[in-house]
Design a protein with these regions (language model features):
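Helix-to-loop junction immediately C-terminal to a conserved catalytic motif
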Residues: 21-53
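Non-catalytic C-terminal accessory region of glycerolipid acyltransferases
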Residues: 2-4, 8, 113-231
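Alpha-helical membrane-targeting segments
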Residues: 3-29, 87-104, 179-186
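Short, basic, glycine/proline-bearing loop/turn elements
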Residues: 23, 102-109, 136-139
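Structural motif corresponding to alpha-helix initiation and N-cap regions
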Residues: 32-35, 93, 116-119
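Short, flexible loop segments at the rims of nucleotide/cofactor-binding pockets, characterized by
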Residues: 23-29, 108-113, 143-144
Length: 231
């Protein structure tokens, strides 16, 4: 991965941070909780933030929840390949490809049926100590409820030993700009306690695809617990 795509997310996210913080923190109603759960995470080691996926605003809201000087910024992301967005109308100009990459979103090598190949770019980022935002459900919710997670998130914890921080985003589902401006919704970003390999798997066993799905189910359960405690 070129240095340009490692540096550009830091520049963009830092430049936009004052505006997103002002928008979400002052104009909108929002609440950030659980940052104290990250206090003892080691610096220089990759961290996965496992987030429920409710809207296109999710990748903007997550970095805005951190302080400007946070060691967890910039945030990198998993995304779909550019051709996935070919039926997205005018938005396909921006979705995928260059515009996603400069924000920190890199495509999964989907369809390979191999986690190491699918997550190749993201494994590299984590090995370099970056923060990775991943949406375990693999797509945005259609009814506002949490969906079943895919196994890739747990695979990263197993392969790299990196902590998985469950994150719940609330109030964004089917949120309109009018709702935002009129402050009809309260938005929330809730960070849970980190989960580790031993929280997701039994010690010493050989892993299968079903084991990774079961491990991700533990992560989704932690996100569900955060949802229950929100507001």
């Amino acid at each position: 991965m070129s240095k340009f795509y490692l540096i550009s997310p830091l520049i963009l996210q830092k430049c936009l941070w004052p505006f997103t913080w002002l928008f979400f923190g002052v104009i909108c109603r929002w609440q950030v909780s659980g940052l104290e759960n990250l206090k003892y995470l080691k610096t220089g080691k990759g961290i996965v933030f496992a987030v429920n996926h409710t809207s296109e605003m999710d990748p903007i809201l997550v970095p805005a929840a951190f302080p400007f000087s946070s060691k967890y910024l910039p945030m990198f992301y998993t995304s779909r390949r550019k051709d996935f967005y070919s039926n997205s109308g005018w938005r396909q100009i921006f979705y995928g490809g260059f515009f996603f990459k400069i924000w920190g979103a890199h495509a999964l090598n989907s369809g390979k049926r191999n986690y190491e190949i699918s997550l190749q770019n993201h494994i590299e980022l984590l090995k370099e100590g970056k923060s990775l935002c991943i949406f375990p459900e693999g797509k945005t919710t259609r009814d506002g409820n949490l969906m079943e997670g895919r196994g890739g998130t747990a695979y990263l914890a197993d392969k790299l030993g990196c902590p998985i921080v469950p994150v719940y985003l609330g109030g964004l589902f089917k949120l309109s700009f009018k709702d935002l401006i009129l402050r009809r919704r309260k938005l929330s970003v809730s960070f849970g306690e980190p989960l580790y390999r031993h929280d997701l798997f039994h010690k010493g066993e050989m892993r299968s695809a079903s084991d990774y799905k079961a491990g991700t189910a533990v992560i989704m359960s932690a996100i569900a617990d955060l949802k229950k405690r929100t507001f």
